[in-house]
Amino acid sequence: MESSASTSASTSTADVVVIGGGPGGYVAAIRAAQLGLSTVCVEMDKTLGGTCVNVGCIPSKALLSSSEHFEFAKHAAAAHGIGIGQLSLDLSTMLKRKDDVVAQNTKGIEFLFRKHKITWAKGFGTLKPGNVVEVTTGGGGGAGGPPAQKIATYQAKNVIIATGSVPIQLPFLKFDERRILSNVGALTIPQVPKHLIVIGGGIIGLELGSVWSRLGAKVTVIELLPAILPGMDDDVVREADRILRKQGLEIRIGTRVTNGGLTDTGVFVEVDKAGATERIEGDHVLVSVGRKPATSGIDVAALGLNVGKRGEILVDDRMRTNLPNVYAIGDCVPGPMLAHKASDEGVVAAEVIAGKPSRMHYKSIPGVVYTWPEIASVGLTERQVKESGREYRTGRFPFSANGRARSMGDAVGFVKMVADARTDELLGVHMLGPNVSELIAEIVLAFEYRGSSEDIGVTVHAHPTLSEVTKEAALATLGRSLHI
């Protein structure tokens, strides 16, 4: 496809204008530019990378890693013959390291934009009828901010909406990012709190709760549902709950938060469990009850854009909306709000625009929880398979029977497989254990090719490695596990 870009006195044209520079948007822009399309990416933040790189995936993993080192030094180093002496924590250095990691990543994205000659339009993008994108200062002049000033206007041959998501607030706990925190504020607490209250026992709540727990905070996790980690396999949830409690997290399930606010020294929440009410006070409260699509620059009614009940933009497996030459990707479309999903959707959108036969495969998107031990999964849970009426069999193998896990001192958790009883096709794989975020990739590849447990079981895995647990779980599914 021939690239074309021109500029008039008031309007520039481009083959592709991407609204949003997060993991979906910036990847879409890079792929579009690789395919020879003149590309503009509109991003209002000072740095590219969106929530994931700036205040999500990357900084949280930096803190998780630092806190795991601290935990090792405090509790496990002696068993390896390593004497630490008097252990101390320099939180300001830890937070600076986190910021440095983020800066390295954002600067890397800027370099890639320069390399591929992508125009970064620094401002707030608004999609107008006819695929016109206006770029203004600030957040579009809303929410009591200064009036928006137009920076640029683009006539786009194709538009990719990649506006991401925002955390959901509770009506009585509005984010101030000092005491009442979203994921953003939870990454910058200036000193280890004595008591951190976490509302929501999902991925964000447990990951960030684990960080501050390891660093010395009392952490209380309050979950409305009967179990933490909604949507995960029941066996994984039970074991994760047990391990996290053993690590020191106070987990309250089946508990509703009915009220909350600030005190003179911190915060309070009021909770109700089966009619019994209680007031809990702490230094900070992290509200992690989910996220919602962010589409403030997209007037869906005026545009005639089809959206779902949560405001998510409806698309097909080629990321096409109901409007001609308008695509949408990432957290603002249906499906799990995952950075890797957004990135792959960005690639698909760019390739479809370029005329390639690309489409998304939603069946094989992995999910990871970066607690310790880690949790990873792909496909259906055993409960989902059972409820479908499909005949199946399962196999399970523990890390406690794996030589590498024992040599590392991290022999907890297991790998569990669910396979079709007749065809042996893998239907779901669920992992809890050391470094399973890396082990799940093998299974995702098998899912792409509708692989079987036997495909995994007959594949030679290096010894001694953690990946042997995956092989043994596959063999267990076939009834012939070797080491248990």
Language-model features: where?
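Glycine-rich flavin
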Residues: 2-7, 11-14, 30-192, 220, ...
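Beta1/beta-strand and adjacent pyrophosphate-binding region of the FAD-binding site
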Residues: 10-22, 192-202
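Short hydrophobic core segments
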Residues: 17-19, 125, 153-164, 198-199, ...
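Flexible, glycine-rich terminal cap/loop adjacent to redox cofactors
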Residues: 19-24, 28, 33-45, 51, ...
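N-terminal Rossmann-fold NAD(P) dinucleotide-binding loop
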Residues: 25, 205-206
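Gly/Ala-rich phosphate-binding loop of Rossmann-like dinucleotide-binding domains
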Residues: 29, 33, 209, 213-214
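FAD-site-proximal beta/loop scaffold in flavoenzymes
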Residues: 176-193, 279-353
